[in-house]
Amino acid sequence: MALTYMNMALAFTVSLLGLLMYRSHLMSSLLCLEGMMLSLFVTMALTILNSNLVLASMIPIILLVFAACEAALGLSLLVMVSNTYGVDHVQNLNLLQC
């Protein structure tokens, strides 16, 4: 089981490095964030299954709900930026005003 945790930690680290290195495009940043959330979900689910915590079994589902909300907001922001400016660069996000 330690190999599974090591793989999930590696997946989280690779996603975090991708977020830090390829942060010029919004779509790349969103994909890296989704990879981080997926690795966190799998790690939390495996930890709860291994420790037999019945009361904490809803925590991974709550994490998935927040990940879905984050993805929906990120994609709506991506559509708004690409319709307004024609590109999905992250530096265009500070130009959005209400």
Curated annotation (Swiss-Prot):
It catalyses: a ubiquinone + NADH + 5 H(+)(in) = a ubiquinol + NAD(+) + 4 H(+)(out). GO terms for cellular component: mitochondrial inner membrane; respiratory chain complex I. GO terms for molecular function: NADH dehydrogenase (ubiquinone) activity. Gene3D superfamilies: 1.10.287.3510. One of its GO terms (biological process) is ATP synthesis coupled electron transport. It comes from Pteropus scapulatus (Little red flying fox). This is NADH-ubiquinone oxidoreductase chain 4L. Disulfide bonds: none annotated. Core subunit of respiratory chain NADH dehydrogenase (Complex I) which is composed of 45 different subunits. Keywords: Electron transport, Membrane, Mitochondrion, Mitochondrion inner membrane, NAD, Respiratory chain, Translocase, Transmembrane, Transmembrane helix, Transport, Ubiquinone. It holds the Pfam family Oxidored_q2. It is a multi-pass membrane protein. It is found in: Mitochondrion inner membrane. Core subunit of the mitochondrial membrane respiratory chain NADH dehydrogenase (Complex I) which catalyzes electron transfer from NADH through the respiratory chain, using ubiquinone as an electron acceptor. Part of the enzyme membrane arm which is embedded in the lipid bilayer and involved in proton translocation. The chain crosses the membrane at residues 1-21, 29-49, 61-81.
